[in-house]
């Protein structure tokens, strides 16, 4: 029975990898979106700390799982910059680019907001992050199944 469960898990991992355009070994299953956000942010922050980088960029418009984790990281000495969100719920790649400093270790923004319908320019933000050598996380819970998610093309490091 354990072998069958392992095979099903591997099959699910391969299916998700095809959907997201990543390698199966890059898929980690969690109990849900909040745990995934927490794990991604805490892991990226720890990597940043090891490199002497303790600045994170996000927005005040994020899910509480992200905002609460950012608050906890601030208590650990991280600096968090919350970008202003336009009236339409958008944040531009230019805003992200202007906020990046040599100390920035992570950018985390919501892919889509289900309350107002905004879909952020994830590929452009991801490109800015990739060019700056900054990890990029997006909470895509509300986007999954509605818009294409391609972690390679959109330069997403953590999802």
Describe these PLM feature segments.
Residues 1-159:
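Pyridoxal 5′-phosphate
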């Amino acid at each position: 029975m354990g072998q069958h469960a392992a095979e099903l898990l591997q099959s699910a991992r391969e299916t998700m990898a095809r959907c997201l355009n990543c390698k199966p070994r890059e898929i980690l299953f969690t109990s849900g979106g909040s745990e995934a956000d927490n794990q991604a942010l805490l892991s990226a922050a720890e990597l940043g700390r090891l490199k002497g980088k303790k600045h994170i960029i996000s927005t005040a418009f994020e899910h509480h799982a992200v905002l609460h984790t950012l608050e906890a990281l601030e208590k650990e000495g991280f600096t968090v910059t919350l970008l202003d969100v336009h009236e339409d719920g958008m944040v531009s790649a230019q805003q992200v680019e202007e906020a990046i400093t040599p100390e920035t270790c992570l950018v985390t923004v919501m892919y889509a907001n289900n309350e107002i319908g905004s879909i952020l320019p994830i590929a452009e933000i991801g490109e800015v992050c990739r060019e700056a050598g900054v990890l990029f996380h997006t909470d895509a819970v509300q986007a999954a199944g509605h818009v294409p998610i391609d972690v390679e093309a959109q330069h997403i490091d953590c999802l």
